A protein has these predicted regions:
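Iron-sulfur-associated redox domains of electron-transfer enzymes in respiratory
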Residues: 1-347
Length: 347
């Protein structure tokens, strides 16, 4: 119920179009999954590491410049969606990209840094013009005098970016990017949909490292998932030392993933409502469960089956990792100096 009212509130704040970034997440999976397959089959740099967490990217550029070739070249979902808005969507609507102002509402403070990167521009035009956090959005709604609880429930704008899948939904929890990618990689390797759609091996919201070895049509894919930079350091040092056994690694800067991002509302731990149940359930657990529940409720749960994603490639991009896709949806990284290694506290 909150989502519909949030959409209504944003329209009353002055936004002319409101889209769900889950569409961008589906697009990211198409590009990232294809990139991974290319590296696996063509002798590319492995392990490949996810690139959608800007806090992690910042850490890598300062502390692990020698490992930057391991990072996926894919932009993060909201940057990809911004690039599509200012290219395909602008073209479809006869609007000059320079006249479009894209604002991303994010759970992450580091997204403000990400959108300023020169590598996140196309022909000098930024994919995203401004980033506000979920906490800042709540403050804007309150200060504008909008009576949130009395708002009607409204839906996202549909046109060319209204559809999204369960795979896009689970991006927000640690392990979600990995699972979403594996659903599509499985299909591309086998030509069939996985009967049991979930990959329980990579699920969990806790900070730390999880690993799994998956046999996909005779191809063994070793994967690791971690959130929090302390855990990431362990995996990165293994790569440096030449002892890493993985093909694909997901790294999230925030323990638990984006659900625990630095821009999210402050919430204390709470007990489950059932008074007979004394199990402590934290807000991270509740948010993770909410995303997995929404994934299960989706009719379509694999990014490659999103009809609007299919249409976008047919009419505009050509195919994943095409020349046009690389121009719009991929980025690059550069080693930087001036920062000592970041000390983090995982909660």
């Amino acid at each position: 119920p909150v989502t519909g009212k949030m959409i209504a509130a944003m329209r009353r704040l002055g936004f002319e179009r409101v889209y769900d970034v889950n569409f961008g997440a589906d697009l990211t999976i198409m590009e990232e999954g294809t990139e991974l397959l290319g590296r696996l089959t063509n002798g590319g740099v492995l392990p490949m590491i996810t690139s959608c967490s800007p806090g992690w990217i910042n850490y890598a550029e300062y502390n692990y410049g020698d490992l930057l070739p391991h990072l996926s070249s894919c932009k993060s979902p909201h940057q990809m969606q911004g690039a599509i808005i200012k290219s395909y969507w602008a073209e479809q609507n006869g609007i000059d990209p320079k006249d479009i102002f894209v604002v991303s509402v994010m759970p992450c403070v580091a997204k403000k840094f990400e959108k300023e990167r020169e590598q996140e521009k196309v022909n000098g035009i930024p994919d995203v013009d401004a980033v506000i956090t979920t906490r800042e959005l709540a403050r804007m709604i309150r200060r504008s005098g909008i009576l949130f609880k009395k708002l009607p429930d409204e839906d996202w704008d549909q046109d060319i970016m209204g559809d999204y899948t369960g795979a896009g939904v689970i991006f927000g929890v640690t392990g979600g990017v990995m699972e979403a990618a594996l659903r599509t990689v499985y299909f591309k390797l086998t030509g069939e949909e996985k009967q049991e759609i979930t990959f329980e091996e990579v699920r969990g919201h806790e900070a730390g490292i999880r690993e799994a070895s998956l046999d996909i049509n005779g191809t063994t894919v070793n994967v690791a998932i971690c959130s929090g930079m302390r855990s990431a350091k362990v995996l990165l040092d293994q790569i440096r030392e030449g002892t890493s056994k993985y093909h694909f690694i997901e790294i999230m800067g925030c323990p638990g993933g984006c659900i625990n991002g630095g821009g999210q509302p402050y919430i204390r731990e709470c007990f489950l409502p059932d008074e007979d149940d004394d199990i402590m359930d934290t807000y991270k657990e509740k948010r993770a469960k909410a995303l997995y529940s929404e994934d299960e409720a989706q009719t379509i749960r694999q990014s490659h089956n999103n009809p609007q994603i299919i249409e976008l490639y047919e009419k505009f991009l050509g195919e994943p990792n095409s020349h046009k896709a690389h121009e719009l949806l991929h980025t690059s990284y550069a080693e930087r100096e001036g920062f000592n290694e970041i000390a983090t506290v995982e909660e």
